[in-house]
Amino acid sequence: MPELPEVETTRRGIAPHILHHPITAVTLRHTQLRWPIDKALSRNLPGRTLVRADRRGKYLLLAVDDGRTLIWHLGMSGSLRIVEPTEPPGKHDHIDLRFAHGRVLRYHDPRRFGAFLATADDPAQHALICHLGPEPLTDDFNGEYLYERSRKRSTAVKSWIMDSRVVVGVGNIYANESLFLAKIHPLRAAGKLTRPACHRLADIIKAVLARSITQGGTTLRDFVGGDGKPGYFAQQLNVYGRGGEPCPVCAKPLTEKPLSQRTTVYCTHCQN
């Protein structure tokens, strides 16, 4: 599933190609994604211009010059790429936005769990967005915030930091990696984290996500950046996907087990 670094990589990749260039055509090949796409968008978006590309959690927010905002979620397997108009659409290429310069923003989603919505209201108040926690790369997310929020929480810390109401964008890959680097056992109750541990974890989450963004997201499964190129962060994973292999620090076998229906990999020696 594309997480925060993948979505941010996509935003940065497509923004120069889609902002301040009039939309000339919208093609909706399949309108049944996670929620039905408003077919009227194929009629009322052409002639409009996108003026800003933001991100909130895993949602792309594309501001239209008429006050609307397009809310785009990549779902489990989606990607947005800039392609030439001569490139024929594939089986899972569901949406095309063509711009005056001739190039096309193409949405690819084999599993159709993504979303393409429009709102005339403040997107921050949209039902999909209003409950989200702070962005992890902002000053609002820090060790003191984690410490205060975690008090009396019995939830396993890995599940807790993956809760988008606590902080957005810490998906399974990044939760595994961050907890390993912070030397925190993923099954430890969040409420038992010390203040220093919370500060350490917050700093490491920021560093892991920032590094992944710099390297273009991960290469896992279907993700490619807005330029169609894969990311390279997967080449630097310490624990995720390496259950049973030697720990990169102590060489003891890494433990792998399910937690909240997600694969969890950790070192029982380093993360005790």
UniProtKB/Swiss-Prot annotation:
Annotated EC: 3.2.2.23, 4.2.99.18
Record-level Gene Ontology MF annotations: 8-oxo-7,8-dihydroguanine DNA N-glycosylase activity; class I DNA-(apurinic or apyrimidinic site) endonuclease activity; damaged DNA binding; zinc ion binding
Binding positions (DNA): H92, R111, R153
Catalytic reactions on record: Hydrolysis of DNA containing ring-opened 7-methylguanine residues, releasing 2,6-diamino-4-hydroxy-5-(N-methyl)formamidopyrimidine; 2'-deoxyribonucleotide-(2'-deoxyribose 5'-phosphate)-2'-deoxyribonucleotide-DNA = a 3'-end 2'-deoxyribonucleotide-(2,3-dehydro-2,3-deoxyribose 5'-phosphate)-DNA + a 5'-end 5'-phospho-2'-deoxyribonucleoside-DNA + H(+)
Cofactor binding note from Swiss-Prot or TrEMBL: Binds 1 zinc ion per subunit.
Cofactor: Zn(2+)
CDD domains: EcFpg-like_N
Zn finger spans (FPG-type): 238-272
Record GO biological process: base-excision repair
UniProt-annotated catalytic positions: P2 (schiff-base intermediate with dna), E3 (proton donor), K58 (proton donor), R262 (proton donor)
Keywords: DNA damage, DNA repair, DNA-binding, Glycosidase, Hydrolase, Lyase, Metal-binding, Multifunctional enzyme, Zinc, Zinc-finger
Gene3D superfamilies: 1.10.8.50, MutM-like, N-terminal
Pfam families: Fapy_DNA_glyco, H2TH, zf-FPG_IleRS
PROSITE patterns, alphabetized: FPG_CAT (PS51068), ZF_FPG_1 (PS01242), ZF_FPG_2 (PS51066)
Role according to the record: Involved in base excision repair of DNA damaged by oxidation or by mutagenic agents. Acts as a DNA glycosylase that recognizes and removes damaged bases. Has a preference for oxidized purines, such as 7,8-dihydro-8-oxoguanine (8-oxoG). Has AP (apurinic/apyrimidinic) lyase activity and introduces nicks in the DNA strand. Cleaves the DNA backbone by beta-delta elimination to generate a single-strand break at the site of the removed base with both 3'- and 5'-phosphates.
PANTHER family: FORMAMIDOPYRIMIDINE-DNA GLYCOSYLASE
Family note: Belongs to the FPG family.
NCBIfam families per UniProt: fpg, PRK01103.1
Assembly and interaction partners: Monomer.
Entry protein name: Formamidopyrimidine-DNA glycosylase
Organism for this UniProt entry: Teredinibacter turnerae (strain ATCC 39867 / T7901)
